[in-house]
UniProtKB/Swiss-Prot annotation:
GO terms for molecular function: rRNA binding; structural constituent of ribosome. It comes from the Bacteria. This is Small ribosomal subunit protein uS14. It holds the Pfam family Ribosomal_S14. It comes from Neorickettsia sennetsu (strain ATCC VR-367 / Miyayama).
Amino acid sequence: MAKKALVVKDERKRALACRSREKRSAVRNMRNDKTISLKERVAIQAKLNSLPRNSSPARSKNRCSITGRPRGYYRKFGISRIQLRVLANWGKLPGVVKSSW
């Protein structure tokens, strides 16, 4: 089980990234606009750098919704590999069957 503080910290990062998504994307689009002069684009890059670091969506980690484990995460189910195995063995995941040949 992951530490609760790390799970809460990651939730805060996701919330901040969600709140500042539009502003960050607007500044990024202005920075990538080739019609603007290089000097102005450097100033826009400085503006992008002044945004909070945790407002970037790349800084949040995918975590298991049950245990909070950050590694071995399956996006399709939203859980870690360990919980996937447990729930699949119990038959709690629809459409998941144990393979045999």
